């Protein structure tokens, strides 16, 4: 069972994903410059990588698969070393790698939370999670691709504004789903008990 309701998660995800893009719509040049700095801004990379590593380790600690019970302490130490080691020895594109790992653990939460909500609209969250899984895998292996995508997306003010508008609209759509469809599905599940 997920620690958060899908309606709450959708509102949080929609706001966090959408609201920064208001800046991109209003001031595309400044927003584009900020985005172009992201792939090599190492302080953000430390935060993202360590937060994602801690979250992954928390997930591992809660895992109860008996096949891995004997290896769990070893795996815990190994993954902690990998997360910290990435911060120390793989600083090139560390923010991209940290974001990629964060997307992977966030996608797990999204899928786990959406699993039992009885509405087809949950597929919006599930598909979004799988997009993040694919992006997480791809950007972990080839983080320079995010730099290239950001450079393409911010090449002109018009493109930056348009893409920011699309992301803002999607974020608001997810918020709307959280306030309507997901909340209604959760209420009917409670009423049916």
Q: What label would you give each PLM region?
A:
Residues 173-193:
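Juxtamembrane boundary at the C-terminal end of a transmembrane helix
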Residues 67-131, 135, 147:
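Membrane-proximal helix-loop-helix units in multi-pass membrane proteins
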Residues 136-151:
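Transmembrane alpha-helical segments of integral membrane proteins
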Residues 14-24, 49-59, 80-83, 106-113, ...:
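Helical transmembrane-bundle signal
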């Amino acid at each position: 069972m997920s620690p958060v309701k899908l309606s709450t998660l959708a509102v949080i995800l929609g706001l966090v994903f959408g609201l920064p893009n208001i800046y991109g719509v209003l001031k595309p040049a400044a927003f584009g410059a900020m985005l172009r700095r992201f792939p090599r801004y190492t302080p953000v990379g430390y935060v993202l990588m360590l937060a994602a590593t801690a979250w992954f380790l928390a997930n591992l600690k809660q895992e109860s698969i008996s096949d891995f019970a004997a290896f769990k302490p070893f795996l815990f130490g190994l993954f902690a070393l990998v997360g910290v080691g990435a911060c120390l020895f793989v600083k090139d594109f560390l923010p991209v790698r940290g974001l990629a790992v964060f997307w992977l653990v966030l996608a797990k939460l999204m899928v786990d939370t959406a699993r039992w909500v009885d509405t087809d609209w949950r597929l919006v969250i599930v598909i979004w999670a799988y997009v993040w899984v694919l992006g997480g895998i791809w950007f972990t292996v080839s983080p320079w691709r995010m730099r290239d995508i950001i450079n393409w997306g911010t090449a002109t003010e018009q493109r930056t504004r348009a893409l920011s508008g699309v992301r803002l609209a999607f974020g608001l759509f997810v918020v709307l789903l959280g306030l309507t469809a997901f909340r209604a599905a959760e209420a009917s599940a409670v009423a049916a008990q």
